[in-house]
Protein backbone atom coordinates (compact mmCIF):
# COMPACT_ATOMS: atom_id res chain seq x y z
CA UNK A 1 0.00 0.00 0.00
CA UNK A 2 1.42 3.43 -0.89
CA UNK A 3 2.27 5.84 1.85
CA UNK A 4 -0.54 8.16 2.85
CA UNK A 5 0.02 11.88 2.75
CA UNK A 6 -1.40 13.83 5.66
CA UNK A 7 -1.12 17.17 4.03
CA UNK A 8 1.28 18.52 6.67
CA UNK A 9 4.86 17.98 7.56
CA UNK A 10 4.41 17.57 11.32
CA UNK A 11 2.69 15.15 13.68
CA UNK A 12 -0.43 17.31 14.02
CA UNK A 13 -1.90 15.97 10.77
CA UNK A 14 -3.97 13.21 12.34
CA UNK A 15 -7.22 14.91 11.34
CA UNK A 16 -6.07 15.30 7.72
CA UNK A 17 -5.03 11.64 7.73
CA UNK A 18 -8.45 10.61 8.99
CA UNK A 19 -10.18 12.53 6.20
CA UNK A 20 -7.91 11.06 3.52
CA UNK A 21 -8.02 7.43 4.66
CA UNK A 22 -11.33 6.24 3.11
CA UNK A 23 -10.43 7.40 -0.41
CA UNK A 24 -6.90 5.97 -0.09
CA UNK A 25 -8.14 2.60 1.17
CA UNK A 26 -10.99 2.17 -1.33
CA UNK A 27 -8.89 0.45 -4.07
CA UNK A 28 -7.65 -2.08 -1.51
CA UNK A 29 -11.04 -3.10 -0.08
CA UNK A 30 -12.70 -6.08 -1.72
CA UNK A 31 -16.17 -6.26 -0.19
CA UNK A 32 -18.92 -3.65 -0.18
CA UNK A 33 -19.61 -4.41 3.48
CA UNK A 34 -16.03 -3.58 4.52
CA UNK A 35 -16.04 -0.39 2.46
CA UNK A 36 -19.33 0.76 3.98
CA UNK A 37 -17.94 0.02 7.44
CA UNK A 38 -14.81 2.13 6.75
CA UNK A 39 -16.88 5.06 5.47
CA UNK A 40 -19.09 4.87 8.54
CA UNK A 41 -16.15 4.71 10.96
CA UNK A 42 -14.03 7.44 9.42
CA UNK A 43 -17.03 9.65 8.67
CA UNK A 44 -18.31 9.64 12.26
CA UNK A 45 -18.64 13.26 13.39
CA UNK A 46 -17.85 12.41 16.99
CA UNK A 47 -14.58 10.76 15.91
CA UNK A 48 -13.59 13.86 13.93
CA UNK A 49 -14.31 16.02 16.96
CA UNK A 50 -12.25 13.78 19.23
CA UNK A 51 -9.32 13.89 16.81
CA UNK A 52 -9.45 17.68 16.72
CA UNK A 53 -9.48 17.79 20.52
CA UNK A 54 -6.58 15.34 20.61
CA UNK A 55 -4.52 17.56 18.30
CA UNK A 56 -5.25 20.64 20.41
CA UNK A 57 -4.27 18.84 23.61
CA UNK A 58 -1.17 17.44 21.94
CA UNK A 59 -0.17 20.96 20.91
CA UNK A 60 -0.63 22.36 24.41
CA UNK A 61 1.24 19.44 25.96
CA UNK A 62 4.30 20.54 24.01
CA UNK A 63 3.80 24.11 25.18
CA UNK A 64 3.38 22.77 28.72
CA UNK A 65 1.26 25.72 29.89
CA UNK A 66 1.10 25.99 33.67
CA UNK A 67 -0.68 28.63 35.74
CA UNK A 68 1.65 31.31 37.06
CA UNK A 69 -0.40 31.59 40.25
CA UNK A 70 -3.47 29.96 41.79
CA UNK A 71 -5.15 33.08 43.19
CA UNK A 72 -5.79 35.35 40.22
CA UNK A 73 -9.22 36.38 41.51
CA UNK A 74 -7.87 37.46 44.90
CA UNK A 75 -4.99 39.27 43.22
CA UNK A 76 -7.44 41.17 41.02
CA UNK A 77 -9.45 42.22 44.09
CA UNK A 78 -6.28 43.41 45.83
CA UNK A 79 -5.26 45.32 42.72
CA UNK A 80 -8.64 47.02 42.50
CA UNK A 81 -8.44 48.03 46.16
CA UNK A 82 -4.97 49.50 45.66
CA UNK A 83 -6.04 51.43 42.59
CA UNK A 84 -8.93 53.01 44.47
CA UNK A 85 -6.36 54.85 46.62
CA UNK A 86 -4.45 56.16 43.60
CA UNK A 87 -5.17 59.27 41.56
CA UNK A 88 -7.73 58.19 38.96
CA UNK A 89 -6.97 58.76 35.30
CA UNK A 90 -8.73 57.36 32.23
CA UNK A 91 -6.62 54.18 32.09
CA UNK A 92 -7.14 53.34 35.79
CA UNK A 93 -10.88 53.96 35.43
CA UNK A 94 -11.02 51.62 32.44
CA UNK A 95 -9.08 48.91 34.30
CA UNK A 96 -11.31 49.20 37.38
CA UNK A 97 -14.36 48.94 35.16
CA UNK A 98 -13.01 45.78 33.53
CA UNK A 99 -12.10 44.14 36.84
CA UNK A 100 -15.57 44.83 38.23
CA UNK A 101 -17.39 43.09 35.35
CA UNK A 102 -19.07 39.79 36.36
CA UNK A 103 -17.76 37.89 33.34
CA UNK A 104 -14.15 38.89 34.09
CA UNK A 105 -14.57 37.85 37.73
CA UNK A 106 -16.08 34.54 36.61
CA UNK A 107 -13.19 33.96 34.20
CA UNK A 108 -10.60 34.52 36.94
CA UNK A 109 -12.56 32.27 39.30
CA UNK A 110 -12.57 29.45 36.73
CA UNK A 111 -8.84 30.00 36.18
CA UNK A 112 -8.20 29.53 39.90
CA UNK A 113 -10.41 26.42 40.04
CA UNK A 114 -8.45 24.81 37.21
CA UNK A 115 -5.11 25.91 38.65
CA UNK A 116 -5.99 24.45 42.06
CA UNK A 117 -7.49 21.31 40.43
CA UNK A 118 -10.54 21.81 42.57
CA UNK A 119 -12.94 19.75 40.45
CA UNK A 120 -14.83 17.63 42.98
CA UNK A 121 -18.34 18.82 43.94
CA UNK A 122 -18.97 19.83 47.51
CA UNK A 123 -21.42 17.35 49.00
CA UNK A 124 -23.74 18.24 51.87
CA UNK A 125 -22.76 16.87 55.28
CA UNK A 126 -24.01 13.40 56.22
CA UNK A 127 -27.35 13.63 58.08
CA UNK A 128 -27.17 12.92 61.82
CA UNK A 129 -30.42 10.96 61.99
CA UNK A 130 -29.25 7.83 60.13
CA UNK A 131 -29.69 4.62 62.09
CA UNK A 132 -26.39 2.76 62.50
CA UNK A 133 -28.13 -0.53 61.75
CA UNK A 134 -29.77 0.83 58.63
CA UNK A 135 -28.59 -0.30 55.21
CA UNK A 136 -25.84 1.68 53.51
CA UNK A 137 -27.19 5.01 52.36
CA UNK A 138 -25.94 7.18 49.52
CA UNK A 139 -26.53 10.90 49.37
CA UNK A 140 -26.54 11.99 45.74
CA UNK A 141 -26.82 15.49 44.41
CA UNK A 142 -27.66 15.99 40.74
CA UNK A 143 -27.98 19.17 38.71
CA UNK A 144 -30.63 18.65 36.03
CA UNK A 145 -31.56 22.22 35.10
CA UNK A 146 -34.75 22.11 33.02
CA UNK A 147 -34.18 18.68 31.50
CA UNK A 148 -35.96 15.56 32.79
CA UNK A 149 -34.11 13.45 35.33
CA UNK A 150 -34.04 10.55 32.90
CA UNK A 151 -35.22 7.81 35.25
CA UNK A 152 -38.52 6.10 36.04
CA UNK A 153 -39.64 4.78 39.42
CA UNK A 154 -42.11 2.17 40.63
CA UNK A 155 -43.41 0.72 43.90
CA UNK A 156 -42.06 -2.74 44.72
CA UNK A 157 -45.10 -4.99 45.08
CA UNK A 158 -43.46 -7.13 47.76
CA UNK A 159 -41.72 -4.57 49.98
CA UNK A 160 -43.71 -1.43 49.13
CA UNK A 161 -40.45 0.48 48.63
CA UNK A 162 -40.02 3.08 45.89
CA UNK A 163 -37.29 1.80 43.56
CA UNK A 164 -35.67 3.00 40.35
CA UNK A 165 -37.30 1.04 37.52
CA UNK A 166 -35.36 2.33 34.53
CA UNK A 167 -32.46 4.64 33.67
CA UNK A 168 -32.91 6.47 30.37
CA UNK A 169 -29.76 6.49 28.26
CA UNK A 170 -28.23 9.95 27.86
CA UNK A 171 -30.32 11.53 30.63
CA UNK A 172 -29.03 13.35 33.71
CA UNK A 173 -29.19 10.21 35.87
CA UNK A 174 -27.36 8.13 33.27
CA UNK A 175 -24.64 10.72 32.75
CA UNK A 176 -24.01 10.96 36.50
CA UNK A 177 -23.40 7.22 36.85
CA UNK A 178 -24.61 7.47 40.45
CA UNK A 179 -28.15 6.12 40.20
CA UNK A 180 -28.88 2.55 39.12
CA UNK A 181 -31.85 0.32 38.43
CA UNK A 182 -33.08 -1.24 41.67
CA UNK A 183 -31.85 1.55 43.96
CA UNK A 184 -34.36 2.28 46.73
CA UNK A 185 -35.42 5.92 47.00
CA UNK A 186 -35.83 7.27 50.57
CA UNK A 187 -35.80 11.07 50.26
CA UNK A 188 -35.97 13.78 47.61
CA UNK A 189 -34.69 17.20 48.70
CA UNK A 190 -35.16 16.17 52.32
CA UNK A 191 -38.77 15.02 51.78
CA UNK A 192 -39.38 11.39 52.85
CA UNK A 193 -41.00 9.40 50.04
CA UNK A 194 -41.53 6.01 51.69
CA UNK A 195 -45.29 6.58 52.08
CA UNK A 196 -45.83 8.41 48.80
CA UNK A 197 -47.14 7.12 45.51
CA UNK A 198 -44.84 7.28 42.44
CA UNK A 199 -47.10 9.95 40.91
CA UNK A 200 -46.58 12.21 43.94
CA UNK A 201 -42.81 11.77 43.77
CA UNK A 202 -42.83 12.63 40.08
CA UNK A 203 -44.59 15.89 40.94
CA UNK A 204 -41.87 16.71 43.50
CA UNK A 205 -39.18 16.07 40.89
CA UNK A 206 -41.01 18.10 38.24
CA UNK A 207 -41.20 21.11 40.56
CA UNK A 208 -37.52 20.89 41.49
CA UNK A 209 -35.04 22.94 39.50
CA UNK A 210 -31.27 23.09 39.71
CA UNK A 211 -29.69 20.77 42.27
CA UNK A 212 -31.72 17.81 43.56
CA UNK A 213 -30.56 15.77 46.55
CA UNK A 214 -31.50 12.09 46.82
CA UNK A 215 -31.13 9.72 49.73
CA UNK A 216 -31.04 6.18 48.33
CA UNK A 217 -30.15 2.66 49.40
CA UNK A 218 -28.05 1.13 46.61
CA UNK A 219 -29.26 -2.00 44.90
CA UNK A 220 -27.39 -5.18 45.81
CA UNK A 221 -27.39 -6.34 42.19
CA UNK A 222 -24.58 -4.81 40.19
CA UNK A 223 -25.34 -3.61 36.69
CA UNK A 224 -23.18 -4.96 33.91
CA UNK A 225 -22.22 -2.31 31.37
CA UNK A 226 -24.10 -2.63 28.10
CA UNK A 227 -22.02 -3.89 25.21
CA UNK A 228 -24.69 -3.41 22.53
CA UNK A 229 -23.44 -2.13 19.20
CA UNK A 230 -25.20 0.54 17.21
CA UNK A 231 -28.57 -0.65 15.97
CA UNK A 232 -30.88 1.36 13.73
CA UNK A 233 -34.49 0.58 12.90
CA UNK A 234 -37.06 1.99 10.52
CA UNK A 235 -40.44 2.61 12.12
CA UNK A 236 -43.26 0.97 10.18
CA UNK A 237 -46.07 2.65 12.13
CA UNK A 238 -46.93 5.95 13.81
CA UNK A 239 -46.55 6.15 17.58
CA UNK A 240 -47.68 8.72 20.14
CA UNK A 241 -46.83 7.84 23.77
CA UNK A 242 -49.59 10.16 25.00
CA UNK A 243 -52.15 7.80 23.45
CA UNK A 244 -50.52 4.62 24.76
CA UNK A 245 -52.20 3.40 27.95
CA UNK A 246 -49.57 0.71 28.49
CA UNK A 247 -46.46 2.91 28.63
CA UNK A 248 -45.07 3.16 32.19
CA UNK A 249 -44.31 6.88 31.87
CA UNK A 250 -45.82 9.01 29.11
CA UNK A 251 -43.29 11.79 29.69
CA UNK A 252 -40.46 9.35 28.99
CA UNK A 253 -41.99 8.17 25.70
CA UNK A 254 -40.59 8.94 22.26
CA UNK A 255 -43.04 9.78 19.49
CA UNK A 256 -42.28 8.91 15.87
CA UNK A 257 -43.85 8.64 12.44
CA UNK A 258 -43.90 5.83 9.92
CA UNK A 259 -40.59 5.88 8.04
CA UNK A 260 -38.55 7.55 10.81
CA UNK A 261 -35.10 6.10 11.50
CA UNK A 262 -34.45 5.40 15.19
CA UNK A 263 -31.26 4.43 16.99
CA UNK A 264 -31.83 1.78 19.65
CA UNK A 265 -29.98 2.75 22.83
CA UNK A 266 -31.06 -0.14 25.06
CA UNK A 267 -33.00 -3.41 24.81
CA UNK A 268 -32.55 -4.37 28.47
CA UNK A 269 -36.32 -4.30 28.97
CA UNK A 270 -38.12 -6.91 26.86
CA UNK A 271 -41.24 -4.74 26.68
CA UNK A 272 -39.93 -1.19 26.38
CA UNK A 273 -36.85 -0.30 24.36
CA UNK A 274 -34.95 2.96 24.67
CA UNK A 275 -34.35 4.86 21.44
CA UNK A 276 -33.69 8.27 19.94
CA UNK A 277 -34.16 9.75 16.50
CA UNK A 278 -31.15 9.15 14.25
CA UNK A 279 -29.06 12.29 13.89
CA UNK A 280 -30.67 13.99 16.90
CA UNK A 281 -28.03 15.94 18.83
CA UNK A 282 -29.97 15.42 22.06
CA UNK A 283 -28.37 12.38 23.75
CA UNK A 284 -31.44 11.54 25.85
CA UNK A 285 -33.32 8.40 24.88
CA UNK A 286 -37.06 7.82 25.06
CA UNK A 287 -39.25 4.76 25.54
CA UNK A 288 -40.78 2.91 22.60
CA UNK A 289 -42.64 -0.42 22.57
CA UNK A 290 -40.35 -3.35 21.77
CA UNK A 291 -40.86 -5.25 18.54
CA UNK A 292 -42.21 -8.34 20.30
CA UNK A 293 -44.57 -6.33 22.52
CA UNK A 294 -45.92 -4.26 19.62
CA UNK A 295 -46.44 -7.34 17.45
CA UNK A 296 -48.25 -9.11 20.26
CA UNK A 297 -50.72 -6.34 21.01
CA UNK A 298 -51.34 -5.59 17.32
CA UNK A 299 -52.07 -9.28 16.76
CA UNK A 300 -54.62 -9.18 19.58
CA UNK A 301 -56.33 -6.14 18.05
CA UNK A 302 -56.02 -7.36 14.47
CA UNK A 303 -59.64 -8.49 13.89
CA UNK A 304 -60.76 -4.97 14.83
CA UNK A 305 -58.32 -3.05 12.68
CA UNK A 306 -58.43 -5.07 9.49
CA UNK A 307 -59.71 -3.03 6.56
CA UNK A 308 -61.82 -4.41 3.78
CA UNK A 309 -59.68 -6.13 1.12
CA UNK A 310 -59.34 -4.34 -2.19
CA UNK A 311 -61.54 -6.23 -4.61
CA UNK A 312 -60.27 -6.46 -8.16
CA UNK A 313 -63.11 -5.26 -10.34
CA UNK A 314 -62.97 -5.38 -14.09
CA UNK A 315 -61.87 -1.77 -14.12
CA UNK A 316 -59.22 -2.19 -11.44
CA UNK A 317 -57.78 -5.21 -13.18
CA UNK A 318 -56.26 -2.80 -15.66
CA UNK A 319 -53.78 -1.96 -12.93
CA UNK A 320 -52.24 -5.40 -13.34
CA UNK A 321 -51.74 -4.84 -17.04
CA UNK A 322 -49.69 -1.65 -16.58
CA UNK A 323 -46.46 -3.64 -16.50
CA UNK A 324 -47.04 -4.54 -20.14
CA UNK A 325 -48.30 -1.28 -21.65
CA UNK A 326 -45.02 0.49 -22.32
CA UNK A 327 -43.51 -2.67 -23.78
CA UNK A 328 -45.97 -2.94 -26.67
CA UNK A 329 -46.37 -0.93 -29.82
CA UNK A 330 -49.82 -2.24 -30.77
CA UNK A 331 -52.19 0.33 -29.28
CA UNK A 332 -55.19 -1.91 -29.95
CA UNK A 333 -54.03 -4.25 -27.21
CA UNK A 334 -54.12 -1.47 -24.63
CA UNK A 335 -57.31 -2.56 -22.94
CA UNK A 336 -58.13 -4.02 -19.55
CA UNK A 337 -58.12 -7.71 -20.33
CA UNK A 338 -56.19 -9.29 -17.47
CA UNK A 339 -57.68 -10.87 -14.38
CA UNK A 340 -54.86 -10.76 -11.86
CA UNK A 341 -54.47 -14.14 -10.19
CA UNK A 342 -52.45 -12.86 -7.24
CA UNK A 343 -54.20 -9.64 -6.27
CA UNK A 344 -57.69 -10.73 -5.18
CA UNK A 345 -56.99 -9.24 -1.76
CA UNK A 346 -54.23 -7.67 0.23
CA UNK A 347 -52.03 -9.96 2.24
CA UNK A 348 -52.68 -9.29 5.93
CA UNK A 349 -50.32 -11.85 7.45
CA UNK A 350 -47.57 -9.37 8.30
CA UNK A 351 -47.68 -7.16 11.37
CA UNK A 352 -45.51 -4.13 10.55
CA UNK A 353 -43.57 -2.81 13.54
CA UNK A 354 -39.86 -2.16 12.97
CA UNK A 355 -37.24 -3.17 10.42
CA UNK A 356 -33.53 -3.15 11.21
CA UNK A 357 -31.74 -0.98 8.67
CA UNK A 358 -28.25 0.16 7.75
CA UNK A 359 -26.84 2.98 5.56
CA UNK A 360 -26.24 2.07 1.91
CA UNK A 361 -24.83 3.98 -1.02
CA UNK A 362 -24.63 2.51 -4.49
CA UNK A 363 -21.11 2.07 -5.83
CA UNK A 364 -20.29 2.94 -9.44
CA UNK A 365 -19.65 -0.68 -10.40
CA UNK A 366 -22.95 -1.94 -8.96
CA UNK A 367 -26.17 -2.59 -10.84
CA UNK A 368 -28.88 0.00 -10.42
CA UNK A 369 -31.58 -0.60 -7.84
CA UNK A 370 -34.93 -1.78 -9.14
CA UNK A 371 -37.49 1.04 -9.12
CA UNK A 372 -41.00 -0.13 -8.28
CA UNK A 373 -43.93 2.19 -8.98
CA UNK A 374 -47.23 1.66 -7.18
CA UNK A 375 -50.49 3.56 -7.47
CA UNK A 376 -54.22 3.29 -8.15
CA UNK A 377 -55.63 3.10 -11.67
CA UNK A 378 -55.97 6.52 -13.31
CA UNK A 379 -53.49 8.31 -11.05
CA UNK A 380 -51.13 9.02 -13.98
CA UNK A 381 -48.49 6.44 -13.18
CA UNK A 382 -48.18 5.29 -16.82
CA UNK A 383 -47.74 8.83 -18.10
CA UNK A 384 -44.96 9.47 -15.57
CA UNK A 385 -43.33 6.21 -16.60
CA UNK A 386 -43.58 7.14 -20.28
CA UNK A 387 -42.04 10.57 -19.70
CA UNK A 388 -39.14 8.97 -17.83
CA UNK A 389 -38.42 6.61 -20.72
CA UNK A 390 -38.54 9.42 -23.25
CA UNK A 391 -36.25 11.60 -21.11
CA UNK A 392 -33.38 9.09 -21.34
CA UNK A 393 -33.89 5.84 -23.27
CA UNK A 394 -30.30 4.79 -22.56
CA UNK A 395 -30.72 5.08 -18.81
CA UNK A 396 -34.24 3.76 -18.17
CA UNK A 397 -35.80 0.52 -19.32
CA UNK A 398 -38.95 -1.59 -18.92
CA UNK A 399 -39.58 -5.31 -19.01
CA UNK A 400 -40.87 -7.27 -22.00
CA UNK A 401 -43.89 -9.37 -20.95
CA UNK A 402 -44.43 -13.07 -21.68
CA UNK A 403 -47.54 -14.42 -23.40
CA UNK A 404 -48.93 -17.71 -24.72
CA UNK A 405 -51.06 -16.21 -27.50
CA UNK A 406 -49.97 -16.72 -31.12
CA UNK A 407 -47.59 -14.14 -32.55
CA UNK A 408 -49.14 -11.76 -35.07
CA UNK A 409 -47.55 -10.97 -38.41
CA UNK A 410 -46.38 -7.48 -37.44
CA UNK A 411 -44.89 -8.61 -34.10
CA UNK A 412 -41.33 -9.71 -33.33
CA UNK A 413 -40.45 -12.15 -30.58
CA UNK A 414 -38.75 -10.35 -27.69
CA UNK A 415 -39.93 -6.89 -28.78
CA UNK A 416 -43.66 -6.59 -28.07
CA UNK A 417 -43.80 -9.90 -26.19
CA UNK A 418 -41.77 -12.98 -25.43
CA UNK A 419 -43.89 -15.78 -26.93
CA UNK A 420 -43.82 -19.14 -25.13
CA UNK A 421 -46.00 -22.24 -24.99
CA UNK A 422 -48.82 -22.63 -22.49
CA UNK A 423 -47.11 -25.66 -20.94
CA UNK A 424 -43.86 -23.72 -20.40
CA UNK A 425 -45.78 -20.74 -18.98
CA UNK A 426 -47.61 -22.95 -16.48
CA UNK A 427 -44.33 -24.63 -15.53
CA UNK A 428 -42.73 -21.23 -14.90
CA UNK A 429 -45.73 -20.24 -12.77
CA UNK A 430 -45.28 -23.36 -10.65
CA UNK A 431 -41.58 -22.50 -10.28
CA UNK A 432 -42.41 -18.93 -9.14
CA UNK A 433 -40.67 -17.31 -12.09
CA UNK A 434 -43.38 -14.69 -12.60
CA UNK A 435 -43.77 -11.52 -10.58
CA UNK A 436 -47.37 -11.19 -11.79
CA UNK A 437 -49.46 -13.02 -14.38
CA UNK A 438 -53.01 -13.10 -15.72
CA UNK A 439 -55.27 -14.79 -18.25
CA UNK A 440 -57.44 -13.39 -21.03
CA UNK A 441 -59.36 -15.41 -23.62
CA UNK A 442 -57.46 -18.59 -22.65
CA UNK A 443 -54.07 -16.90 -23.13
CA UNK A 444 -51.61 -16.12 -20.33
CA UNK A 445 -49.75 -12.82 -19.92
CA UNK A 446 -47.14 -12.11 -17.28
CA UNK A 447 -43.99 -10.29 -16.12
CA UNK A 448 -41.11 -12.62 -15.31
CA UNK A 449 -38.28 -12.15 -12.86
CA UNK A 450 -35.79 -12.86 -15.65
CA UNK A 451 -37.16 -9.92 -17.65
CA UNK A 452 -36.25 -7.62 -14.75
CA UNK A 453 -32.78 -9.13 -14.58
CA UNK A 454 -32.38 -8.57 -18.31
CA UNK A 455 -32.99 -4.82 -17.99
CA UNK A 456 -30.64 -4.49 -15.01
CA UNK A 457 -27.93 -6.47 -16.83
CA UNK A 458 -27.91 -3.76 -19.52
CA UNK A 459 -26.85 -1.26 -16.83
CA UNK A 460 -30.24 0.45 -16.93
CA UNK A 461 -32.71 1.51 -14.28
CA UNK A 462 -35.62 -0.93 -14.51
CA UNK A 463 -39.02 0.76 -14.08
CA UNK A 464 -41.58 -1.75 -12.88
CA UNK A 465 -45.17 -1.04 -11.84
CA UNK A 466 -46.97 -3.77 -9.93
CA UNK A 467 -49.80 -4.39 -7.52
CA UNK A 468 -48.70 -3.41 -3.99
CA UNK A 469 -48.96 -6.95 -2.58
CA UNK A 470 -46.12 -7.95 -4.94
CA UNK A 471 -43.65 -5.48 -3.45
CA UNK A 472 -42.65 -7.62 -0.46
CA UNK A 473 -41.67 -10.50 -2.78
CA UNK A 474 -39.28 -8.17 -4.64
CA UNK A 475 -37.54 -6.90 -1.50
CA UNK A 476 -34.40 -9.02 -1.88
CA UNK A 477 -30.65 -8.55 -1.80
CA UNK A 478 -30.57 -9.01 -5.58
CA UNK A 479 -32.96 -6.19 -6.52
CA UNK A 480 -32.74 -3.79 -3.54
CA UNK A 481 -35.99 -2.16 -4.75
CA UNK A 482 -36.83 1.48 -4.17
CA UNK A 483 -40.62 1.73 -3.95
CA UNK A 484 -42.42 4.91 -5.00
CA UNK A 485 -46.11 5.39 -4.31
CA UNK A 486 -47.89 7.68 -6.79
CA UNK A 487 -50.75 9.17 -4.81
CA UNK A 488 -53.76 11.08 -6.14
CA UNK A 489 -54.52 14.58 -4.84
CA UNK A 490 -57.78 15.41 -3.09
CA UNK A 491 -61.00 14.55 -4.88
CA UNK A 492 -61.64 18.28 -5.39
CA UNK A 493 -58.35 18.58 -7.29
CA UNK A 494 -59.15 15.44 -9.27
CA UNK A 495 -62.42 16.97 -10.43
CA UNK A 496 -60.60 20.17 -11.35
CA UNK A 497 -57.53 18.72 -13.12
CA UNK A 498 -58.94 15.53 -14.68
CA UNK A 499 -62.27 16.82 -16.00
CA UNK A 500 -61.01 16.66 -19.60
CA UNK A 501 -58.79 13.60 -19.16
CA UNK A 502 -59.70 10.05 -20.13
CA UNK A 503 -59.23 6.59 -18.64
CA UNK A 504 -58.99 3.19 -20.33
CA UNK A 505 -62.25 1.43 -19.55
CA UNK A 506 -62.91 -2.30 -19.47
CA UNK A 507 -66.67 -2.04 -19.38
CA UNK A 508 -66.79 -2.84 -23.04
CA UNK A 509 -64.66 -5.31 -24.94
CA UNK A 510 -63.03 -2.58 -27.00
CA UNK A 511 -61.28 -0.99 -24.02
CA UNK A 512 -62.00 2.50 -25.33
CA UNK A 513 -60.70 5.60 -23.58
CA UNK A 514 -63.56 7.37 -21.83
CA UNK A 515 -63.76 10.51 -19.69
CA UNK A 516 -63.34 10.15 -15.94
CA UNK A 517 -66.55 9.81 -13.97
CA UNK A 518 -67.26 10.64 -10.34
CA UNK A 519 -67.14 6.90 -9.62
CA UNK A 520 -63.63 6.77 -11.10
CA UNK A 521 -62.47 9.52 -8.74
CA UNK A 522 -64.07 7.82 -5.73
CA UNK A 523 -62.50 4.47 -6.64
CA UNK A 524 -59.08 6.09 -7.13
CA UNK A 525 -59.17 7.79 -3.71
CA UNK A 526 -60.45 4.69 -1.93
CA UNK A 527 -57.92 2.42 -3.63
CA UNK A 528 -55.05 4.78 -2.72
CA UNK A 529 -56.18 4.91 0.91
CA UNK A 530 -56.25 1.12 1.19
CA UNK A 531 -52.86 0.78 -0.52
CA UNK A 532 -51.31 3.31 1.85
CA UNK A 533 -52.94 1.77 4.91
CA UNK A 534 -51.96 -1.80 4.11
CA UNK A 535 -48.61 -1.30 2.38
CA UNK A 536 -47.45 2.19 3.28
CA UNK A 537 -44.65 0.75 5.43
CA UNK A 538 -43.09 -0.67 2.24
CA UNK A 539 -43.05 2.67 0.40
CA UNK A 540 -39.75 4.57 0.34
CA UNK A 541 -41.19 7.68 -1.28
CA UNK A 542 -44.67 9.13 -1.83
CA UNK A 543 -45.33 11.57 -4.66
CA UNK A 544 -48.70 13.29 -5.03
CA UNK A 545 -49.56 13.64 -8.72
CA UNK A 546 -51.42 16.93 -8.50
CA UNK A 547 -49.60 18.52 -11.42
CA UNK A 548 -47.95 16.14 -13.91
CA UNK A 549 -44.93 18.38 -14.62
CA UNK A 550 -44.25 18.97 -10.92
CA UNK A 551 -44.66 15.27 -10.11
CA UNK A 552 -42.30 14.32 -12.95
CA UNK A 553 -39.61 16.73 -11.73
CA UNK A 554 -39.94 15.36 -8.19
CA UNK A 555 -39.68 11.81 -9.54
CA UNK A 556 -36.58 12.69 -11.58
CA UNK A 557 -34.92 14.37 -8.60
CA UNK A 558 -35.67 11.31 -6.48
CA UNK A 559 -33.95 9.07 -9.04
CA UNK A 560 -30.88 11.32 -9.16
CA UNK A 561 -30.53 11.19 -5.37
CA UNK A 562 -31.13 7.44 -5.37
CA UNK A 563 -28.00 6.92 -7.45
CA UNK A 564 -25.71 9.22 -5.47
CA UNK A 565 -26.97 9.66 -1.89
CA UNK A 566 -26.85 7.33 1.10
CA UNK A 567 -30.14 5.62 1.94
CA UNK A 568 -31.34 3.32 4.71
CA UNK A 569 -31.96 -0.26 3.57
CA UNK A 570 -32.75 -3.51 5.42
CA UNK A 571 -29.70 -5.04 7.10
CA UNK A 572 -30.43 -8.33 5.35
CA UNK A 573 -29.67 -6.73 1.98
CA UNK A 574 -26.04 -6.15 2.93
CA UNK A 575 -25.36 -8.93 5.40
CA UNK A 576 -27.09 -11.92 3.84
Curated annotation (Swiss-Prot):
Coiled-coil stretches are: none
Q: For the region Phospho-regulated basic and hydrophobic (PRBH) motif, give the residue spans.
A: 289-383
Q: Which domain of life is it from?
A: Eukaryota
Q: Which SUPFAM superfamilies match?
A: L27 domain (SSF101288), P-loop containing nucleoside triphosphate hydrolases (SSF52540), PDZ domain-like (SSF50156), SH3-domain (SSF50044)
In what residue span(s) does the Guanylate kinase-like domain sit?
368-560
Question: Which Pfam family would be a valid example here?
Answer: PDZ
Q: Which InterPro entries match?
A: GK/Ca_channel_bsu (IPR008145), Guanylate_kin-like_dom (IPR008144), Guanylate_kinase_CS (IPR020590), L27_C (IPR014775), L27_dom (IPR004172), L27_dom_sf (IPR036892), MAGUK (IPR050716), MPP7_SH3 (IPR035599)
Give the organism the record lists.
Answer: Bos taurus
List residues traversing the bilayer.
none
Using the record's annotation, list all stretches that form the SH3 domain: 228-298
Q: Which residues carry this modification: Phosphoserine?
A: 409
Cellular compartments annotated: Membrane; Lateral cell membrane; Cell junction, Tight junction; Cell junction, Adherens junction
Does the record bear Disulfide bond in its keywords? Answer: no
Family, according to the entry, reads as follows: Belongs to the MAGUK family.
- Per its UniProt record, what CDD domains does this chain match? GMPK, PDZ_MPP3-MPP4-MPP7-like, SH3_MPP7
Could you tell me what this protein does?
A: Acts as an important adapter that promotes epithelial cell polarity and tight junction formation via its interaction with DLG1. Involved in the assembly of protein complexes at sites of cell-cell contact.
Q: Which named protein is this? A: MAGUK p55 subfamily member 7
Q: How is it modified after translation?
A: Phosphorylated by aPKC which promotes dissociation from the cell cortex.
